[in-house]
Amino acid sequence: KSILAGDNEFDVMFLPMKGAIGLITDGAFLDLETVPTVQLDQPWWYDSYNSAIELEGRLYGAMGGAHLCIHDATRLIAFNADMMERLGLEAPYDTVREGKWTLDALNVYLSAAANLNGDDSAAWKKDGKTIYGYSNNQNGVIKFLQGCGENIVEVRNGKLTYTAGTERFYDCISKLSKVFTTSDAKGINAPNGDDSRDDDGNPGYIYVFTSGRALFSDCEVAKFQGYRTLDFEYGIVPYPKYDEGQKEYSCNTWEG
């Protein structure tokens, strides 16, 4: 209403990108590329994010160092360091630094951790004893796909471009399907909307991890504040690369 009234009450808005789409198409936002005093080439702006949302030379929102939300929303992988030690596994920090943290490397850890422990299946039971390799949220596989350097749609030459369907894309999908098997407890999909609770046997992915029943878990930085009370040590690593030939690790954000 304020924008339509033209009263210029607000100069800047902070809102999720998905909430801005309607305002952008309605013409309510100014193209930042037309504002010479907004120096988007300076290092305090996050070019990797901003270039991904710029279309046909127009940019209606931008992220920079002043936006703490993008840090809180960055997705990482948490691991149970105590469980890893009990399994006789080395924490993967050196593997990450050496550029060898790949889906194959992760699979070694998941296979070592997965254990039904006498349960009749890998299906979640609140009083069960199954240990899972990885606790995944309902959108977790997409983050692994992006960690492999793949996207379904990308901005190329200023236009949205469908980038799925390449041989490498399908190779990544195939490998992910083999890594995150659920029948053997290497992975569990925990879709509960309340990440940290177990309602009627329907667990949130954070709950599976914090209850000590998963070696790894999808997580965003903001969740780590609640990890201070855990009764085990934990560590964090980026999403793995597809293979060692991939140049960089990649972790997205909620809006990524």
Task: Name each model feature, range by range.
Residues 13, 55-75, 85, 99-161:
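Extracytoplasmic/periplasmic solute-binding protein
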Residues 15-74, 104:
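Hinge/lid segment of periplasmic solute-binding proteins
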Residues 107-110, 142-198:
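Glycine-centered hinge/linker elements that transmit conformational signals in sensory
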Residues 33-45, 96-98, 124, 151-171, ...:
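Short, solvent-exposed loop/beta-turn-alpha elements that line the ligand-binding surface or hinge
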Residues 78-81, 254-256:
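A bilobed periplasmic-binding-protein/Venus flytrap-type ligand-binding module shared by bacterial periplasmic
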